[in-house]
């Protein structure tokens, strides 16, 4: 007798990850979800000039949420980000890696 697994297949990797610094203390991330079946996304960050430069998980979002706000960044520090989908079967490959450096001064929006 052949038994089929009831576990879902691994989710596909998120694609088109982008990062935008909003002032000196926030970074907004956005990506495209590829396919269904994920239970959420893990967001990881690394600091460029740190001794280890290893990625560390900084947050999670639920399924069909394709954005994240990192409010724990410092101005003039370069950060790398990547995102991974997950489900009961395991983790997807990572998305593309993006880098962003928040500016020293807050971003000013033009007046209307």
Predicted regions and their residues:
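Recognizes extended acidic, P/S/T-rich segments that occur
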Residues: 41-76, 88-96
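Pro/Thr/Ser/Gly-rich low-complexity, intrinsically disordered linker/stalk tracts
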Residues: 1-38, 75, 88-112
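Residue-level recognition of well-ordered beta-strand positions that form the cores
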Residues: 30-32, 44, 84
